[in-house]
């Protein structure tokens, strides 16, 4: 017995449909960028790599909740480190496509999850 009603969760078939649509959407983006000769940042690939865990300049980054450094406490939005890594994906795509020399962001200058202050207020 599942405590959550079916209308609130995806079953296997629905999950497969979502994955298929994501892949179709990403292919459409890739085709649109190619048709206009534009740089393409592989955000989907980046997020999949983070999901599996990566090491950047000795810093471990993953999608692991709280300790993974990539996602904030809401589990959806990127942390400053996650945003710095994402910026580097865009910078790499631009540099590669256009021969630019935009420097990469130094990820070590950014923080991961900022824990809320749980200390009692003092007077």
Where are these regions (language model features)?
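Residue-identity detector for glutamine
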Residues: 3-5, 20, 104, 123
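Mobile gating loops/cap/lid regions near enzyme active sites that modulate substrate access
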Residues: 1-16, 30-77
